Amino acid sequence: MRTTTSRLVQLSCGLVAAVAFLGMGTAGAEPTLERGRYLVEGPAGCGNCHTPQGPDGPVADMGLAGMMVEKNDMFTAIASNITPGSRVADWTDVQLGRAIREGIRPDGSIIGPSMPFGLYRGISDDDLMSMVMYLRQVPAVDHDPGQSVYNIPLPPAYGPPVISVAEVPHGVTLEYGAYLAGPIAHCTECHTTFGPKGPMFDTHLGAGGFEFHGPWGVSVAPNITPTRLAQYSDAELDDMIRKGVRPDGARMLPPMPYGYLAKMTDEDAAAITLYLRSLPALPDGGQ
C-alpha cells in the first residue's frame, strides 16, 4: 500500500506539470471531471478493453482493472489495469496522458497494439486531461492482468512528440463528428481495412474487413462508408451504433462497445452519423 504522503507529493507534482501542459492548449480551456467521466464511460469506451468480462458482461468491482483483449500469431494483447490500484498511481498526470495519447510509458518503453495510438494522438489537451482527472478517482483495484507479448517489432514511437492539440468546437458538425469517430471513439480504427502496417486510413477509410475473435466467435468490422450506410435512415443507424440492434431487430456482435456508446448524447451521436455520411463510398474491405 502506498503512503498517503507519497501520493500527495505525487499529485502535487502531477498538478504542476499538468498546468504547464495545459498552458500550451486552447486559451481559457478547462478540463473537468464531468467531461472525463462522459468520455471514459461513454464514447471512448475505455472499459470495453480494460474491464474484465464475464459470461454476463463486465465483472463486478473490477472496472478498468485490465484483461486480455486479443490473442493471435502476432501478439497477445493485455489491456493494463488503469485504476489507482496499479502502477499508474506512481505516474504524473502528464506521464499518464502521454501513455494514453502517444503510447509511451514513463520509462520510455512503447505500448503496443491494440491501443489505437494513430488516432489517440488527436485527442485534445482538454479532453486528455479530463480523462486523466476521471481515471485518478475511479475505485482502485488490486489486480494484475499480466503483460502483453509481441512477436512483431514495435516502433520506436508512433510519430513525433505531440506538443499540443487544440479543442474541437462541440456541435453537430463534420469536424466534431470526425473527432468523435476518430480520436475519441476510434470507430475508424476498427472499421478501416488493415494492411501490413495497420489501418490504411489514406486509401481504405471505413471500408471494414478486420476480423475480431472472442467468446462470441468471429465478427468482421463492416463497411461504414455510404456504400453500406446509404440503405439505413439516420434513426436506424443510430440504433445500430447506440443499441447494437439492426433494423430487422437482430442483435449485433461484439466487440463494438454498445453499452458505452449508448451513453452518448443525441448531439454527439448525430455528429458521428453526419461524419460517416460524408465518407467517400468504398467497396467492402477496400477491394
Residue ranges and their predicted role:
Residues 13, 19-27:
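C-terminal segment of classical bacterial N-terminal signal peptides
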